[in-house]
Amino acid sequence: MHTRTVFFISDGTGITAETFGNAILAQFDIKPRHVRLPFIDTEDKAHQAVRRINHTAELEGKKPIVFTTLVNMSVLRIIQENCQGMLLDMFGTFIRPLEGELGIKSLHRVGRFADVSLSKEYTDRIEAINFSLDHDDGQSHRDLSGADVILVGVSRSGKTPTSLYLAMQCGLKVANYPLIPEDFERKQLPPALEPHRKKIFGLTILPERLSQIRNERRPGSKYADLANCRHEVAEAEAMMRRSGIRWLSTTTKSIEEIATTILQEVRPERLVY
């Protein structure tokens, strides 16, 4: 497998450059070494970044790959004219054609989160994160009427990371509840969830994968035993079918794929904004 150092340079956090760059790199069978250089917003910082890139090129004998999301043209020019890496200017690639199509100049505003802390979207997102943390793993039954989505599934099926992703990325208030042996004995959902059935979405997972995950946490326990995992998954899926709950398997899906599927099923309007 090929290895290569990849730089993500931005005058903001670098998250956009890294996300976009990783999506492209995933198409190649390489093992990249990631270096994120955020807040490169002055010419002095640009020269420092160039020195680091060029040192890496000399040390490794290969051109580093450099993804940039820089809106300050003087900073970008220093990188373009001096770095010994393969430069992929993401903003330049898309902004100039868009300026031509829209017939207006871009704002060239540094940092896509400028003034975000004052926006309603930001406030709503913080509230969603707090709600999801308070309602993680069945900790609280309060204010379930305020939930956008309620996730259910056996322990370690992916409920918590999915809840937090939906809160942080989509601003959704998400509660999640583990289905436990007492629920299986009653053959019913937890009583607190019944009034909110329309908001419920189920997560399941292959027993073999569940056993593997649980063994990392509690090796050799009944909790992680494959037979027990098979029993819990079968009972949970049967309960979801009886209750008419929509559900999916998380076994081979990323958090992003799980969250998008839930949005499509439960809150499709949130895909349009």
Curated annotation (Swiss-Prot):
EC number: 2.7.11.33, 2.7.4.28
Binding site for ADP: 153-160
Molecular functions per Gene Ontology: ADP binding; ATP binding; phosphotransferase activity, phosphate group as acceptor; protein serine/threonine kinase activity
Recorded family membership: Belongs to the pyruvate, phosphate/water dikinase regulatory protein family. PSRP subfamily.
Reaction equation(s) it catalyzes: [pyruvate, water dikinase] + ADP = [pyruvate, water dikinase]-phosphate + AMP + H(+); [pyruvate, water dikinase]-phosphate + phosphate + H(+) = [pyruvate, water dikinase] + diphosphate
Function: Bifunctional serine/threonine kinase and phosphorylase involved in the regulation of the phosphoenolpyruvate synthase (PEPS) by catalyzing its phosphorylation/dephosphorylation.
InterPro entries per record: Kinase-pyrophosphorylase (IPR005177), PSRP (IPR026530)
Record keyword Ubl conjugation present: no
Transmembrane domains' residue ranges: none
Keywords for the protein's UniProt record, in alphabetical order: Kinase, Nucleotide-binding, Serine/threonine-protein kinase, Transferase
Keyword Kinase belongs to the record: yes
Protein name: Putative phosphoenolpyruvate synthase regulatory protein
